[in-house]
Curated annotation (Swiss-Prot):
GO terms for cellular component: PCNA complex. Homotrimer. Forms a complex with activator 1 heteropentamer in the presence of ATP. This is Proliferating cell nuclear antigen. GO terms for biological process: leading strand elongation; mismatch repair; regulation of DNA replication; translesion synthesis. One of its GO terms (molecular function) is DNA binding. Residues 61-80 bind DNA. SUPFAM superfamilies: DNA clamp. CDD domains: PCNA. Belongs to the PCNA family. It comes from Styela clava (Sea squirt).
Length: 264
């Protein structure tokens, strides 16, 4: 038997919104320690990894390890039926072919119950190696989303340059070029969620397809800040915290010069 009850059901709705445009189907792996998910997008360019710890749920029960194959589009449709203040419960029997989703209003005057068919998925878990990064930038989630949206009007790729002075995002295209630079600001008069921090051991400059960064930025409602971890020639990591219960990480391989020349 698997059962997970989340008082702040809106967090689960936000997680679903953050995943559905990148991953069409995925295995939700449930153990006694929580729920995890790892999947690549259909073009195998980006990878998403989700962790929700058991202690973040009001009730969490998982009698035996369970891999639930879920159609993300179907789940998104059902999740839209839940109110933002609803309590959400996920429930499945061992070896079940259905996932039960229960939405309870916070006042207790409405109880909705849905069943969703599970899929048989053959998912290969990729080992994500531990990595020390040359540069880690933390900035407001909304600011990151705005930068990605703005520069996507200019070009299809964004160059992220990280130095001790700050981080710069730049793009160029047929209409011209644009760049946005953020300097570190961590003063006591600045709210924590509005701060920009840069931890750097060596300068980094990498190029990425901006359409993926725009998809990652859909996780912005989950957390007031986002962390970008970079090193030359390794995938970028974009990490959002999920309340006090876990995180969602996106991995995106940088574009190499040959690819950039073909795109231009």
């Amino acid at each position: 038997m698997f059962e997970a009850r989340l008082i702040q059901g809106s967090n689960l709705k936000k997680v679903q919104e953050a995943l559905k445009d990148i991953v069409t189907e995925a295995s939700w792996d449930c153990t006694s320690s929580g729920i995890s998910l790892q999947a690549m997008d259909s073009s195998h360019v980006s990878l998403v990894q989700l962790t929700l710890r058991a202690d973040g749920f009001e009730n969490f029960r998982c009698d035996r390890n369970l891999a639930m194959g879920i159609n993300m589009t179907s789940m998104a449709k059902i999740m839209k039926c839940a109110g933002n203040d609803d309590i959400i419960t996920l429930r499945a029997e061992d070896n079940a072919d259905m996932l039960e989703l229960i939405f309870e209003s916070s006042k207790g005057d409405k109880y909705s119950q849905y069943e969703m068919k599970l899929m048989d998925l053959d998912c290969e878990q990729l080992g994500i190696p531990e990595q020390d990064y040359s540069c880690c930038v933390t900035l407001p989630s909304q600011e990151f989303g705005r930068i990605c949206r703005d520069l996507s009007q200019i070009g299809e790729c964004v160059v992220i340059t990280c130095t001790k002075d700050g981080v710069q995002f730049s793009a160029k295209g047929d209409l011209g070029a644009g760049k946005i630079k953020l300097k570190q600001n961590t003063g006591s008069d600045i709210k924590e969620e509005e701060q920009v921090t840069v931890e750097i051991s060596e300068p980094v400059q990498l190029t990425f397809a901006i359409k993926y960064l725009n998809l990652f930025a859909k996780a912005s409602p989950l957390s007031p800040s986002v962390c970008l971890s970079m090193s030359n020639n390794v995938p970028l990591v974009v990490e959002y915290k999920v309340a006090d219960m876990g995180h969602i990480k996106y991995f995106l391989a940088p574009k190499i010069e040959d690819e950039e020349e073909q795109d231009s």
